[in-house]
């Protein structure tokens, strides 16, 4: 299983003595694009990425996600591995306004669908705040 840390502390919150700094980094929005870049560079297979991020976690928690099958949520992405870009904090949506991955190569999904609804198209957020929902262990 591969997972992301996401601790969206601002630069101001991080600008303290080491023992007073909140731990973690923002990572939820950049994790998958960084791994997709690894797929393009043949460091990681696409099958291993899908099983590690989608299939295995949904199997472990017994939730209806992780695969495109009847009876599961219609969550999926559309990716073009030829569309590589550099990560820029101004293009991300986290409240913290920075990323430790600034300038790294990545491949962001062209489209993101959640429960069959298109939420992202060509890096633009179409969905409204609050569309997501918590899905706990079944």
Regions found by a protein language model. Give the residues of each.
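His/Asp/Glu-enriched, well-ordered alpha-helical/loop segment
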Residues: 1, 7-81
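Thr-Gly-centered strand-to-loop micro-motif
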Residues: 3-4, 121
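C-terminal cap of metal-dependent C-N hydrolases
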Residues: 73-133
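Peripheral (often C-terminal) accessory segments that flank ATP-dependent C-N-forming ligase machineries
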Residues: 134-138
């Amino acid at each position: 299983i591969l997972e992301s840390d996401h601790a969206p502390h601002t630069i101001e919150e991080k600008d303290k003595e080491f023992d007073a700094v909140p731990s973690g980094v923002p990572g939820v929005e950049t994790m998958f694009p960084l791994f997709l870049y690894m797929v393009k560079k043949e460091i990681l297979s696409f099958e291993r990425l899908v099983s590690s991020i989608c299939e295995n976690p949904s199997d472990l928690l017994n939730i209806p996600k992780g695969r495109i099958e009847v009876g599961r949520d219609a969550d999926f992405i559309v990716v073009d591995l030829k569309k590589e870009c550099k990560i820029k904090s101004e293009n991300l949506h986290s409240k913290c306004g920075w990323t430790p991955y600034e300038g790294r190569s990545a491949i962001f999904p062209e489209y993101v669908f959640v429960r069959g609804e298109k939420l992202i198209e060509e890096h633009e957020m179409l969905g409204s705040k609050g569309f997501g929902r918590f899905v706990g262990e079944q």
